[in-house]
């Protein structure tokens, strides 16, 4: 599907900021304290969903994010996501699993229930799914704008500095 709009975001509290994707990533919250939400919601058709069924995780992330991150060139976004969602990063699953799936599913109860595994990333937490992308996204935006940003974060011990893979 061809993108024919420039996605902008506004505050949930009503202030009409009209900010782009990269702007809201750096701002975090709207000036009035609200969260950012898209001004319009992209339409995804049944055909789109069918076409996306067999994509890799990185490819599917690209198809969805390109609808919202219209200020990032598509080739750049695609490369970024392919670099983030890689088999060698998401390889902390069960022995014998296909790590290329990034988020494999497994069946229980005779196949009646399927569980999506979101804890195969570097810190073994579901948060890796978003945070790995967010790190790459910040690097891209800050480099493009030739600026720096200091982020102070706090975490609990289960995904923080007690993890061997965490770099401080």
Sequence positions of predicted segments:
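PLP-dependent amino-acid enzyme catalytic core
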Residues: 1-167
């Amino acid at each position: 599907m061809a993108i024919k709009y420039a996605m902008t975001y506004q505050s949930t509290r009503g202030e009409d900021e009209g900010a782009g994707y990269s702007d809201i990533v750096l701002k975090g919250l709207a000036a009035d304290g609200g969260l950012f939400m898209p001004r319009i919601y992209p339409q995804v058709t049944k055909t789109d969903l069918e076409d996306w069924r067999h994509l890799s995780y990185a490819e599917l992330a690209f198809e969805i994010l390109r609808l919202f991150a219209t200020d990032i060139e598509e080739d750049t976004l695609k490369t970024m996501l392919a670099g983030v969602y890689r088999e060698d990063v998401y390889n902390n699953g069960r022995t014998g699993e296909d790590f290329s799936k990034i988020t494999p599913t497994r069946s229980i109860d005779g196949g009646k229930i399927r569980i999506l595994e979101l804890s195969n990333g570097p810190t073994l937490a579901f948060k890796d799914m978003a945070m790995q992308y967010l790190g790459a996204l910040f690097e891209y935006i800050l480099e493009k704008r030739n600026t720096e940003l200091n982020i102070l974060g706090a975490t609990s011990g289960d995904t923080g500095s007690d993890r061997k893979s965490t770099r401080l």
